[in-house]
Structures are given as C-alpha cells and as structure tokens.
From Swiss-Prot:
Keywords: Membrane, Transmembrane, Transmembrane helix
Top-rank lineage group of the source organism: Eukaryota
Spans annotated as Disordered: 241-262, 290-574, 785-1050
Subcellular compartments: Membrane
TM ranges: 63-87
Name of the coding gene: NPIPB3
Entry protein name: Nuclear pore complex-interacting protein family member B3
Biased composition (Pro residues): 349-359
Keyword set includes Plastid: no
Chief place where the protein resides: membrane
Organism: Homo sapiens
Length: 1050
C-alpha cells in the first residue's frame, strides 16, 4: 500500500475551485476511484480553505489514499474537523477581511458578532451571504478569491515600478534613495489607498468630507516636500485617475506596517489647518502668499520681482541690483548714468543738470548714445573725427568755415547743403559725395574726365583731345557737349548709345578707340576671314579659292558685308560694356552690332520708341530693345545664357539683317519685312520666339531649337535649318507664308497648312514629335534655299568643306546625273531631280522624305491623301498618289508616276501605300517564296494597327485674338457630306433597305430533287489505298527550293 500525503498550503489553496480540481487530478491521476467522490473531496477542500499564514509548513489536511497490490482501491479520507474549525477561528481572528483598513475591519467585526443563521453583506461583492455555523469560511472569499490574488500581485508590481522609477531618477542625477524619500513614498502610498477607499464608498458619509480635506492637504504637503506635481483642488477621483489604474488594497503585512500612519492622523482631526512651523516658507508654494511679506534686508535676493507691487526705496546700488523694468519712475540724476545705466531705461528725457564747471571734453560723443539726445550737442572742433555715424542723423550746428579736407572727413550723404568748392575735390572726394549736385567750381582742366565720374555730373564736360584715351567707360553714359562737325567715321570711334551728338574726328581713333567701334562695318581686307568675326560683317565676302579650308564655321551663318580695310589690333583693345546700363531714347533709328553681356540682369533693357540708328553698341545679356518703329536691327549677337523673358519687341521692324541671336531672345513685331541670317543657339528656352505679324522675308536664318516665328504675313522664310533636339512646343506659326525656300527641318517640326500648293525640298526627320509643326494658312511656295551671294563653284567642295559650312546652299554645279540621289543629300537640292530607271534600287530611304516634281492634274481622291484638317480646298487628283508617297510627304501633292504593279504591297511598307503596286516579273526573285503567297494575295490585306507615336494627332488650335482673325480668309468648316472619299465607307443597311428577292430561301425536304442519289457510306474495304497521299520524308524534299526566311518590318 502506497501512502500519498498532499499538503494544502495557503499558496495551494489560493487557487479557485476549477484550478484546484485540475491540480488534484494531476496528483492522483493513477487513482482508480469514482470521479464523483473525488470531486466531492476537492469541493469540500475548496470550501473550507482560506488564505493566511501557513504554520511553519504544518499540514492542514491529509488526504491518505491507499493502493493495495491486488488492484482493489481502498481510499480512506480522514478529515479532522477540529483542525478545520481551528483554521476557521484563526483566519477570522487574524485576517477577517484581507486588504481592509481600520474602518473596514471595525465594520467586519461588527458583522462577525451577529448570530448564526442571519444574512450579512460582503464588503467586496455587496452580496448577501449566509453566516450559519459550519460554513463561515466559504461565505466571504470563495467568489472573490482570484480577484484578491490578482490585486495583490498588481500591487507588488506597481510598487516595484514606482520604486524602480524613483531609483532610476536618482541614479541619473547621481543620488541614492534616502530615508526621507522612502518616507515620502510611503505617505504617497497611504494617500492612494485612502483615495481608493473613498472611491469605493467604503467610508461612512460622515467621514467623507473630512477625508477629502485630508487628501487635499496631504497632496499639497506632499508636493511641497517632494517637488511632485500638485493640484490644489485634487479630489480622490481625480487623484485616482492621475495616478493611473485602480490601486490595489494593501496586504495584511503592509497594513500592519502602515497602521501606525493611519492611526496617528485620523481624518476627522484634519478639519483645521496645521499650526505654523518654522519651515513654512520653504514648504509653502508662493501662490499661497496673498499679502506682501515684511521688508527684509535680503528681499532683493529671495523675493521674486513680480511680487513687489510697490517701488522699493532708493538705494545707492539700485542701478546694479534692481531690474530696469521695475522702475516706474525716473531715477535721480547721477554722475555715472551714462556708464552704468542701460539705454533701455532712458524712456523719459533726463532732467536738466547744472551748468558744467568744465568745458565739454573731446570724449563726450563717445560716452553718450546719440539716440538718447533730443537736442543737438554744442559744436566741437573734432566732431568730424570722433563722432560716430549715428549721431549725424540730426543736423549739425553751424561750425567753423570748412577747410579743404572736409570732404574726406565728413560723408557727403549726411550734408544737407553743398560744400564750398575746393581745388582738390576731384582727387579726395569719395564717390558717395557726388550724389548731390556740385557747386560751381574753377574752369575744368584737361584731366577732369579722369578724376570725376561722368555719371554724377549734371552738366556736360568740355571737349578734350585725349578723351578716348583717359575717359573710363562709365563716363559715356551721359551726353557730350556739342563739338566739331561730325565726320563719316563717327560711328566707328564712339559708341552711339552713349552720345547725343557725334564727337569730333581724331587722327588716332583707330588705335585708341575701344572695341565697341568694331561693331560697324570694317573696310575690306585680305585677312578678314581670319581676324574679323563674321557676326559683325554686313555683306558677303568676295569669293576665294581657299574658303572651304580657312573660313571658320561661324562665318557661314550670316552674310558678310563689304567694309573698309580693318586694323589688325581692333579686336584686342576694345573694352566691354557695363552690364546694367540702359539706353532710353525716343528717337533711335538704328541698332546694329549690339553684343550683349552674359551676366546681365533680366530687367535691364533698352526702351525706345524711335530708334533710328545705334551703331557699334555692344549690349549685354538680358537687354531688350522695345520699339514701335525700328527700321533696321542688324548684326545683333546675343549671349547663349539669356533669360527667357529677354526679347526685342518692335512693332515696325522692316529689316533685321545679319543678326546673330542667342537663346532666350525674341523679336516681336507686327511689321517685320525681312529677318535674315538669324542663327539661334541650340539650348534655347521653349518660350523664346520671334513673333511677327508681317514678316515678308527671312533669308539665311539658322534657327536653333525652341525658336518660333509667329507671323500673320510671312511671305518668305528661307534657309531655316532647325536643330534635331527641338522642344515639342517650338514651331513656326504663320498665316501667310508665301515662300519657304531651302528649309532644312529637323525632327519635331511640321508644316501644317490648309492651302499649301507646293512645299519642296523639305526633309523631315523620321522621329518627329506629333506636336512639332509649322502652322501656316497660306503657304503658296516653298522652294530651294536662297542666297544673298552664292559662293563660286569648287571641285573639292564635297571633300574639304566642314559640316557647318553646308548650312548654306552650294553654288550651281554640273548638270545632275542619274546617281545624284545617292551622292548628294536631298535636302540640299534646290530643284527636283530628273527621273531615273534605277531609283528603286539605289535611292536610300531618306530620299523619299523630299517631295516629287509636279505631277498630273489632281484627281478626286486627293481628300484621302492629304489630311482634311490641313486643307482649305482639295488638292488636284493624281493617279499614282496611293502608290509611292510616304506618309510624311503627303502634306504636298505628288508628281505623276508609272502605273502601279501587283507586288507593290510586298516591296513598300503597307502604312505608306494607299493602293496596291503593279505586278513585276522579278517579284519571285526578290521576294522570298512563301507557301501561302497566292492565298494571302487573294485575301484582303489586314490593316496594321498604328501606334500612338506613329499617329498624327490633329494640331491643337491656337487661341487667336479678335484683332488677329481675318474674316475674309477664315476657312469654312466642311461637313462630312462635302468630302468625297475615294473608297466610300459601306453604310449600315436596315431591314427595309434589303431587297427581299435576293434573300435565299430555305429549301424544304420536299423541294429537294430525289433524282440525285444520296451518297452511301463506304466501308474500309471499299476505299482504294493507292490514292492515299504518302507523307514525304526530309530526304524526299528537293533542296533546290530555298527555305523562306522570316522577314522583318524594316
């Protein structure tokens, strides 16, 4: 027999009934006894146990289970009722209600004194329970047993957290937990427990108010002594919420420890304030001091300044110890006020003082701040030297007569009146002084132009012989006095924008004149092509045999004018023009050869209404010429880094020749008859354009990307090469563009016109953006490039000429041959090539980007070939339009060609054909044989699905103003019925439109003629095996037939 003893300790009995059952089942898992009896035993144990101290581990109950070897179960349970009764008595006497305070314990004792059989109320659950003899242990804590255990564990964890937090704080600050802090922590715990009791309504109503008062005072005292947060009107509920979760009730051991605190200070005794103590001033917060404290010697140190509502008595050291904001009245005068008193306190003027015994000293201006003086100081001899600049905000008193060195010592901007003249003014006077007009001085000498800046003189200077040598460039911003009669070379020697009248001629002008002079035409010279920049020449150079070798590429952008023989050192000695200089004139007829500076501000401009002539002017970037009547603007080189808002705005600009425009430059004109030789920089901003209403001729202009010519009347635009990296919004918009000759267009450029009878020699790039276009309503003629002066022919042009030179057209050469399409780029030909028999073989695909020569009269299907939105009237019909014209080229009519053949669909990409090609005898040789070629030829060709990049979207209509619209030339909107399509789209027929006679009738069985015998089903034996086709092997196939290769789209 095996004896098993189970010791029921308080830790074991602290579990609830279900957990006790599980643990006992684990211990007696091998016992073969009825489960009902074992459950009864466990329930009895659970009903009779109670938490408390274990008596040195001595057993309360012994469960003795005997196991006989013969597998007969004899279970003997000895329950000593005396031990159970003793445990009940001990539990009730030592811990009648765990976690309660003295008030709760007294209430519990009163309930215990009731007789058995009565009903009582549990203090935790507020439920009525029975208290008859023999069942007193299970009446109180069976239901709330687990809640007590969780509350106890939570209290321990919270206490550990608070202690850890305080210790961590002290550890960071280099402190340890002292006995004083431990005492404060215990008092805080007691405060939380009392708040818990008040929250649960466990205190009688008669003691609640006193407890609330005690909580408030204890919180205030705790805050003052510990520095923790304090709320003056803290209630128990608010305190509980601020302290976190519901605090647990104290355990028996803790309540025994802290009973002394609760017994020493009952809540009923805290109805009156505590007696005063010596350390009240330290522990009481300053908010409780509603009356001022009596004066003390150390008030200034210990009392905050906001509590002092009345001014303090004067003291000798007030200026040092008292803050200036507390002084509501001015202080008495003192000798050292200027040194020790800060300037903020001098809000009121100082009282008048006695007359000084000593005269003013030289250091008075140093000690007194100038802003604190409401009246000027007496004059002093050394004011100009020792007085700071702030003092001179007030006018100075009259002083001694000025001396010769006054201009050096006194700044000119602080003088209200002009100074007397002096002999050395021009040498010693700073530049700031000349902001005011100068008094009349001695007659000017020859070196006045050097010493005095010209822009600060209100009157003109007399002429001088050495002006060109010694005068700085700033002087030329003011007009010169009248001089000798002008000569022919005045425009060369002096910049025109700085002269109201021409200067007299001089013999040494060619040597000593700045480089602005060279902006006008020079005399011809043999070495012009090397030494003279091409942008400053107005006429073409004479022909030379070595032009292709020695001429730089920049020269061929503009035609060179004939000029006088230049000097060799002209380009070296010319100074540059200042960037932020403007010429504002109403009558300026001509602006030529204007170079601009790269770092000019965008708002710097030349504003002129009438600009008749500005020669040799070198303009800087971000300079604008705004003119209403500007007849001629020639040789205008612009800098490439120009701001996009920099432009030349003109209403009447008849001729702009040889102008070299840089990026971010616009010419906006209403009447601009000719704009020639305008090279643009490739990195131009998309908003840079030439806007003109009347631009009859633009010749030889080299346009770079992001440049636009917007014109209503643009008769001729020739020689316009565009850069391949053009922005999609860059375009040439014209309503009347009669002639565009020799234009070399790069990708992202289109010419969209409604009436475009002829556009020749316009090669387009295959990678053109859909939004790049030249929009024109009237473009009657676009033919080959025009030249002002063609170059002489040369045999080695194609070999030795650099690529830049070919931006201009070549001179006429020998008659064209049959292979010209291969050797010469098509875009550089002025006229169409003669037909050739081997065009289909030798001509590269780029050739087909140029239009063909004029063809036969137009046909009826032209509306299909040309987009309808770009035509005001239909083009003349042509028989072979559908065959050989590429899609890009169909903006212009095609010339007549040979009749189409049947194999054109194979040789030509389908997207460029509107109709089939004529058959050819050598199709079988050039085209790889396909097994299904005949079948595919009979089937209708499947249209190819176009990509988004290949489709040409309709041009976005530009918003026009009312004044720009010409009602007479406004195209009429054509309806769908007006367009005559060559292949009409089949209409959808209705049921009523179909002829019922053509509808095949369904034949019935009776209508079938029985004379035709029904085919009989044949058997396998009836089939002739000899007629079955045999499967050929690889060896049987004839190798003579080449295997068809897979063709690519290209």
């Amino acid at each position: 027999m095996v004896k098993l003893s189970i010791v029921l300790t308080p830790q074991f009995l602290s579990h609830d009934q279900g957990q006790l059952t599980k643990e006992l089942q684990q211990h007696v898992k091998s016992v073969t006894c009825p489960c009902e009896y074992l459950r009864k035993v466990i329930n009895t144990l659970a009903d009779h146990h109670h938490r408390g101290t274990d008596f040195g581990g001595s057993p309360w109950l012994h469960v003795i289970i005997a196991f006989p070897t013969s597998y007969k179960v004899v279970i003997t349970l000895w329950i000593v009722y005396l031990w159970v009764s003793l445990l009940k008595t001990i539990f009730w006497s030592r811990n009648g209600h765990d976690g309660s305070t003295d008030v709760q314990q007294r209430a519990w004792r009163s309930n215990r004194r009731r007789q058995e059989g009565l009903r009582s109320i549990c203090m935790h659950t507020k439920k009525r329970v029975s208290s008859f003899r023999g069942n007193k242990i299970g009446l109180k804590d069976v239901i709330t047993l687990r809640r007590h255990v969780e509350t106890k564990v939570r209290a321990k964890i919270r206490k550990r957290k608070v202690t850890t937090k305080i210790n961590h704080h002290d550890k960071i600050n280099g402190k340890r937990k002292t006995a004083r802090k431990q005492k404060m922590f215990q008092r805080a715990q007691e405060l939380r427990r009392r708040a818990e009791d008040y929250h649960k309504c466990k205190i009688p109503p008669s003691a609640r108010k006193a407890l609330c008062n005690w909580v408030r005072m204890a919180a205030a005292e705790h805050r003052h002594s510990s520095g923790l947060p304090y709320w003056p009107y803290l209630t128990a509920e608010t305190l509980k919420n601020r302290m976190g979760h519901q605090p647990p009730p104290p355990t028996q051991q803790h309540s025994i420890t802290d009973n002394s605190l609760s017994l020493k200070t009952p809540p009923e005794c805290l109805l009156t304030p505590l007696p005063p103590s010596a350390d009240d001033n330290l522990k009481t917060p300053p908010e409780c001091v509603l009356t001022p404290l009596p004066p003390s010697a150390d008030d200034n140190l210990k009392t905050p300044p906001e509590c002092v509502l009345t001014p303090l008595p004067p003291s000798a050291d007030d200026n040092l110890k008292t803050p200036p904001e507390c002084l509501l009245t001015p202080l008495p005068p003192s000798a050292d006020d200027n040194l020790k008193t800060p300037p903020e306190c001098l809000l009121t003027p100082l009282p008048p003082s006695a007359l000084p015994s000593a005269p003013p000293s030289a250091d008075d201006n140093l000690k007194t701040r100038a802003e604190c003086l409401l009246h000027p100081l007496p004059p002093s001899a050394d004011d100009n030297l020792k007085t700071p600049s702030e003092r001179q905000l007030t006018p100075l008193p009259p002083s001694a007569p000025p001396s010769a060195d006054d201009n050096i010592k006194t700044p000119a901007e602080r003088l209200r009146g002009p100074l007397p003249p002096s002999a050395d003014d021009n040498l010693k006077t700073p530049s700031e002084r000349q902001l005011t007009p100068l008094p009349p001085s001695a007659p000017p000498s020859a070196d006045d132009n050097i010493k005095t800046p010209a822009e600060r003189l209100r009157g003109p200077l007399p002429p001088s012989a050495d002006d060109n040598l010694k005068t700085p460039s700033e002087r030329q911003l003011t007009p010169l006095p009248p001089s000798a009669p002008p000569s022919a070379d005045d425009n060369i020697k002096t910049p025109a924008e700085r002269l109201r009248g021409p200067l007299p001629p001089s013999a040494d002008d060619n040597l000593k004149t700045p480089s602005e002079r060279q902006l006008t035409a020079l005399p011809p010279s043999a070495d012009d092509n090397i030494k003279t920049p091409a942008e400053r020449l107005r006429g073409p150079l004479p022909p030379s045999a070595d032009d292709n070798l020695k001429t730089p590429s920049e020269r061929q952008l503009t035609p060179l004018p004939p000029s006088a023989p230049p000097s060799a050192d002209d380009n070296i000695k010319t100074p540059a023009f200042h960037p932020q200089r403007m010429i504002i004139s109403r009558h300026l007829p001509s602006v030529s050869s204007l170079p601009f500076h790269p770092q000019l501000h965008p708002q710097q401009m030349i504003i002129s209404r009438h600009l008749p002539s500005v020669c040799g002017g070198r303009f800087h970037p971000q300079q604008m010429i705004i003119s209403r009547h500007l007849p001629s603007v020639s040789s205008l080189p612009f800098h490439p880094q120009l701001h996009p808002q920099q432009m030349i705005i003109s209403r009447h600009l008849p001729s702009v020749c040889g102008g070299r425009f840089h990026p971010q430059r616009m010419i906006i004109s209403r009447h601009l008859p000719s704009v020639s030789s305008l090279p643009f920089h490739p990195q131009l901003h998309p908003q840079q354009m030439i806007i003109s209403r009347h631009l009859p001729s633009v010749c030889g202009g080299r346009f770079h990307p992001q440049q636009m010519i917007i014109s209503r009347h643009l008769p001729s635009v020739s020689s316009l090469p565009f850069h391949p990296q053009l922005h999609p919004q860059q375009m040439i918009i014209s309503r009347h563009l009669p002639s565009v000759c020799g234009g070399r267009f790069h990708p992202q450029r289109m010419i969209i016109s409604r009436h475009l009878p002829s556009v020749s020699s316009l090669p387009f790039h295959p990678q053109l953006h859909p939004q790049q276009m030249i929009i024109s309503r009237h473009l009657p003629s676009v033919c080959g490039e025009r030249l002002r002066g063609p170059l002489p022919p040369s045999a080695d042009d194609n070999l030795k000429t650099p690529s830049e030179r070919q931006l201009t057209p070549l001179p006429p050469s020998a008659p064209p041959s049959a292979d010209d399409n291969i050797k010469t780029p098509a875009e550089r030909l002025r006229g169409p090539l003669p037909p050739s028999a081997d065009d289909n073989l030798k001509t590269p695909s780029e050739r087909q980007l140029t239009p063909l020569p004029p063809s036969a009269p137009p046909s009826a299907d032209d509306n299909i070939k040309t987009p309808a939105e770009r035509l005001r009237g239909p083009l003349p019909p042509s028989a072979d339009d559908n065959l050989k014209t590429p899609s890009e080229r169909q903006l212009t009519p095609l010339p007549p060609s040979a009749p189409p053949s049947a194999d054109d669909n194979i040789k030509t990409p389908a997207e460029r054909l509107r109709g089939p090609l004529p058959p050819s005898a050598d199709d079988n040789l050039k085209t790889p044989p396909l097994a299904t070629q005949e079948a595919e030829a009979e089937k209708p060709r499947k249209p190819k699905r176009q990509r988004a990049a290949e489709m040409e979207p309709p041009p976005e209509p530009k918003r026009r103003r009312v004044g720009d619209v010409e009602p007479s030339r406004k195209p009429k909107r054509r309806r769908a019925a007006d367009v005559e399509p060559s292949s009409p789209e089949p209409k959808r027929r209705r049921v009523g439109d179909v002829e019922p006679s053509r509808k095949p009738k369904r034949r019935r069985a009776a209508d079938v003629e029985p004379s035709s015998p029904e085919p009989k089903r044949r058997r396998v034996g009836d089939v002739e095996p000899s007629r079955k086709p045999k499967r050929r092997r690889a060896a049987d196939v004839e190798p003579s037939l080449p295997e068809p290769k897979r063709r690519r789209l290209s």
